[in-house]
Amino acid sequence: MAKLHDKYQETVVAELTKKFGYTSVMQVPRIEKITLNMGVGEAVADKKVMEHAVRDMTAIAGQKPVVTVARKSVAGFKIREGYPIGCKVTLRGERMWEFLERLVDIAIPRIRDFRGLSAKAFDGRGNYAMGVREQIIFPEIDYDKIDKIRGMDIVITTSANTDEEGRALLDAFNFPFKK
């Protein structure tokens, strides 16, 4: 089992129950899923780009991503309906906890000029979204084997009802928020 999952069960549940006065353990917010999304607009011109993006995403997430396609044609972007334009992967369970551990302990500290995560990126329902500018912050990515530096979106979906509860949950996992 992942270290953070054990920490959640042993200490975080008790802390949050005490802080917010929950009457049941099931009321305590938990992380439900983590979604990684990589938009690859250049895939319209070159099909190889999508293969590289899928390879990188597979290495980072530990499971194969779903290739997302354009829902409708947009002449300005030179895309047609059905063109592959990105890839996404949803992590749950054990893989989710392992990814969260790597994100907090290894990847986030490797971000260049990092000054803390924005605390304003909550959506009003306790879910947190962040963007990463380069995939090379993850240790699974070999700098010499990548074709291009790409960013991705990381969305952490929680069962929290408010941003305050969501922030308290992520704070308990040592997320480095700006003070």
Curated annotation (Swiss-Prot):
Molecular function GO labels: rRNA binding; structural constituent of ribosome; tRNA binding
InterPro entries for this protein: Ribosomal_uL5, Ribosomal_uL5_bac-type, Ribosomal_uL5_C, Ribosomal_uL5_CS, Ribosomal_uL5_dom_sf, Ribosomal_uL5_N
Keywords, ordered alphabetically: Ribonucleoprotein, Ribosomal protein, RNA-binding, rRNA-binding, tRNA-binding
GO cellular component terms attached to this protein's record: ribonucleoprotein complex; ribosome
BP-aspect Gene Ontology terms: translation
UniProt similarity note: Belongs to the universal ribosomal protein uL5 family.
Function according to Swiss-Prot or TrEMBL: This is one of the proteins that bind and probably mediate the attachment of the 5S RNA into the large ribosomal subunit, where it forms part of the central protuberance. In the 70S ribosome it contacts protein S13 of the 30S subunit (bridge B1b), connecting the 2 subunits; this bridge is implicated in subunit movement. Contacts the P site tRNA; the 5S rRNA and some of its associated proteins might help stabilize positioning of ribosome-bound tRNAs.
Subunit organization: Part of the 50S ribosomal subunit; part of the 5S rRNA/L5/L18/L25 subcomplex. Contacts the 5S rRNA and the P site tRNA. Forms a bridge to the 30S subunit in the 70S ribosome.
Name of this protein: Large ribosomal subunit protein uL5
Organism: Shewanella sp. (strain MR-4)
Upper classification of the organism: Bacteria, Pseudomonadati, Pseudomonadota, Gammaproteobacteria, Alteromonadales
